């Protein structure tokens, strides 16, 4: 039996998009891995399933990592939804409702309020999340933020000088993080201007991470490295972050439709 899929990306963070509004899709870890495999499948960082919404939500969104794990939130994926549908939408996710609107940049998303207490990240035990008293070699004293999924943010002198593939993997799987962790490194490049990289939980090094950019903005504000609307440069391009009067994090950036294809479910069983 064949099915249609769509490829999209947000700053190079690429997705398989499956529209399940008319025909529901029962995803599982093995199938998500098979579809996401860049050598034997379609290939992506994450798999997005758009379904019907309930109550306040126009649509629902499931997000599956390339390793087969399901995750609560993905900022770049969220920006893709209004672009895919061609309209503003309220999206139901495992992290709650998200307001995603079309904008001149591509899409603008209200990512909600950050969660900052140790048990909301979550961490394995209580500690200050502003400057955590831990270190992994030269990466020291990160700030922890939950933006629908868990992040740590390290401030460094040069994001390109860090052996990030090795250290990111090490930190992701540390016992301090019972649900594993997304790892971000950031440097200040100017007034309200940052440069960052992300090791994404379940996906590895990615060209962009929307929730990572949100978490990095929150960490930078908490550390008084930025004061207002901030431009953040990632390997795949630029996002603009701000905080509204209600303490919600607002993310603006591009989302790009690439192509539509067809495949046979039997190829991935």
From Swiss-Prot:
Its EC number is 5.1.1.7. It is an enzyme of class 5 (isomerase). Pathway: Amino-acid biosynthesis; L-lysine biosynthesis via DAP pathway; DL-2,6-diaminopimelate from LL-2,6-diaminopimelate: step 1/1. Keywords: Amino-acid biosynthesis, Cytoplasm, Isomerase, Lysine biosynthesis. PROSITE patterns: DAP_EPIMERASE. One of its GO terms (biological process) is lysine biosynthetic process via diaminopimelate. It is found in: Cytoplasm. The record marks 151, 200 as: Could be important to modulate the pK values of the two catalytic cysteine residues. It catalyses: (2S,6S)-2,6-diaminopimelate = meso-2,6-diaminopimelate. It comes from the Bacteria. InterPro entries: DAP_epimerase_AS, DAP_epimerase_DapF. GO terms for molecular function: diaminopimelate epimerase activity. Pfam families: DAP_epimerase. The active site is at residues 74, 209. Substrate binds at residues 13, 46, 65, 75-76, 149, 182, 200-201, 210-211. One of its GO terms (cellular component) is cytosol. Catalyzes the stereoinversion of LL-2,6-diaminopimelate (L,L-DAP) to meso-diaminopimelate (meso-DAP), a precursor of L-lysine and an essential component of the bacterial peptidoglycan. Homodimer. Belongs to the diaminopimelate epimerase family. This is Diaminopimelate epimerase.
């Amino acid at each position: 039996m064949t099915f249609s899929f769509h490829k999209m990306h947000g700053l190079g963070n690429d997705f398989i998009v499956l529209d399940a509004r008319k025909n529901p899709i029962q995803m599982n870890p093995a199938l998500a891995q098979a579809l996401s495999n860049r050598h034997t499948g379609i290939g992506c960082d994450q798999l997005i399933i758009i379904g019907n919404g309930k109550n306040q939500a126009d649509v629902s969104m499931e997000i599956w990592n390339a390793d087969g794990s399901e995750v609560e939130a993905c900022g770049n994926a969220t920006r893709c939804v209004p672009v895919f549908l061609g309209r503003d939408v309220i999206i139901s996710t495992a992290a709650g409702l998200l307001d995603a609107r079309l904008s001149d940049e591509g899409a603008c998303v209200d990512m909600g309020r950050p969660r900052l207490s140790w048990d909301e990240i979550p961490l394995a035990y209580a500690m200050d999340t502003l400057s955590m008293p831990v270190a992994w070699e030269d990466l020291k004293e990160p700030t922890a933020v939950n933006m629908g999924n868990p992040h740590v943010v390290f401030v460094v002198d040069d994001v390109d000088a860090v052996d990030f593939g090795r250290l990111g993997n090490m930190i992701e799987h540390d016992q301090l993080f019972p649900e594993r962790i997304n790892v971000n490194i950031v440097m200040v490049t100017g007034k309200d201007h940052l440069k960052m990289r992300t090791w994404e939980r379940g996906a590895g090094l990615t060209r962009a991470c929307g929730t990572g950019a949100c978490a990095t903005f929150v960490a930078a504000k908490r550390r008084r490295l930025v004061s207002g609307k901030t431009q953040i440069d990632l390997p795949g391009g630029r996002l603009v972050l701000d905080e509204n009067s209600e303490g919600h994090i607002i993310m603006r950036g591009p989302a790009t439709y690439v192509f539509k294809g067809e495949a046979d479910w039997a190829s991935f069983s």
